[in-house]
Amino acid sequence: METASRRDHFPNQQLSQTIAQRFAQKSFTPLELYCFNCVFRSLADTESGVHYWSETTLCRFLELPDALGVGSVIFQMASYLGAFPLPSQAPAILTYEALLKVVTILTERYGAVVKKRGREIWLREIYRSLAIYDKGIRSSLEDKEKEKEKDVPAPVSSGNMGFAVDAPDDGDEGDEDEDDELVLAALDSMDAIDAFKHGEQSNVHHSIIPTDNFLKLVELLLLIAPIDAQQSLSTLAPDLSDTRVAELRRAAHVIISSFGVENHPGVTYRTFNAVISTCLPYLFNGLNPLFEHFLFAKDMDLSKRKGGPNSPTKESKPVIPPPKAQSEPILREPGEILNLTILSQLSFFLKGSDLFRRLRPLYSGNTHGFSMGSFEKQVFNWRAPTILLVKGRLLPTTPSTTRERALQDMLPPKRHPSSITPDSLSSNQTLIYGAYISSQWKHTGKTCFGDASTTLFQLSPTHDVFTASAFSHDYTYFSKSPTTPAGLGLGTPIPTQSASHSSHSHSHSHPVFRPGPVSLHLDDALEFAVFTHLAEGGGSFLPSKLPARKGSDWQDRFEIESLEVWGCGGDEVAEEQRRTWAWEEREAEARRRVNLGTGDQEMDRELLKMAGVISGDRSGGSMG
């Protein structure tokens, strides 16, 4: 009886209106609510006395490009979120209250009302808004996953504590009660939990996101990643050419492949949560500023509003200043690897505030030359984080050139397949690996440099991220011959003197190079690269957390086509680098201008000392 009375006391419509009122009171300022009201009423359609937004109106207001075909996906998300906290009422008509809830959730302003584990539960709501519920499809999908798990050999266990740190998390279906924590917390404040628990829970584990819908959404997210709350989508991408659309689609396919959709009809919640949490934590960030547009009432046509005694006059309408002109473009100049689309892909796991309008091109192999010396000259003076990108094609199994044979001789016999599987050889064969290096580059002595924020990643043909491990700190190295390993890379320890001597004794011409369990190595000619991934881990970087790659070992040996380094930082870092380069140039010019040629070494040395080029101990000057 008590439950029944509570359900009668909180009918569905009242529950929906009450939560909308709570969001309005606690999540927005009065000015923001006024702007939202102006936006809604100026564009709303009316039928049977109900004001609402249609799919066409929503897509036109957000300026969603027709070329991406994503309007129906966004409208589906909005229709589901508009029914919050009652999923059985979805799809909801986008009335004032429903659309206010959509904006609250997608701009992540619900925290003032719902404080418990907000981000994690928010991700569940995003999944639900994209998913379809079909137990038949879901059961078939689970059977396929179980069959695949039988075929994948279990990773070899080890007593080494380092491997325990690296062991990929199997994930958890989670308690059913946790699925609705956001909803329960919201209703708890209204004493309506019992009403909700009787028939209002939806099980995310009986659903999937259709691949095509997810692909279209990811294309949009790639496009809007750099958008500002006061920037319209039409100004961000005024000319969405066929070339750009194809570029967005290719990148979206790469990202979608990380969800293992090649062998499945869609994305399950377990896979969605695992991939987003580990490899794409900022994927949905662009939705926040996009839906913030509802809170800026600039240039709105209020002619459709009916005047009334309490209606604000035109003069009382708040004046929202136009967005400030950006002093910097999103990306000053594209590289051979890095363009706007790849930059957006990077922003899905590196903070966009460190990337957009903050990157400077430091080094390009095809511009500055593929040599360690050129790399050092262009990169070492950048005293801020850098992003290294390398692109190439797989080497043939049998070496065809002297250099390829030398690489093969340097490495142990190849025991693992490449990451490009035989059934995908006809599609994307381009390999792109990279790294985020937080420390300034330097010559490697006895130990590597870098810290736990150093990150390895793959951008093609699959999106994957390999974060730093606590087991080992061999993050980054830059070593010239005869130091081994000669070249640059991440994740391989510098051998001790005794180990290096032992390696030389086994091979007089080519010491064997043994890459770390998860590592990237570029040879000292910057001609070839090797990426190694062992699922057992145990090195400086954690193995892949992608469910589709669970237990997988691979090694990609490829010829480098393009190599780039980009500096993260503002004008102040670039100015410091310019000052350092200018100082080095002055030092070199001073050496050239000293008139030597007396034939007397002591006199020549005294002249250099007088010029301040060298000190009394015969060494060159320093920056002090």
Curated annotation (Swiss-Prot):
Pfam families the UniProt entry points to: TLD
Acidic residues bias locations: 167-177
Location of the TLDc domain: 336-569
Cell membrane is among the record's keywords: no
InterPro entries: TLDc_dom
Subcellular location(s) per record: Cytoplasm
Biological process (GO), any one: response to oxidative stress
Keyword list, A-Z: Cytoplasm
Record keyword Acetylation present: no
Gene Ontology cellular-component terms listed: cytoplasm; nucleus
Chain spans, region Disordered: 143-177, 305-328, 488-512
Family membership noted in the UniProt record: Belongs to the RTC5 family.
Functional summary from the UniProt entry: May be involved in a process influencing telomere capping.
Protein name: Restriction of telomere capping protein 5
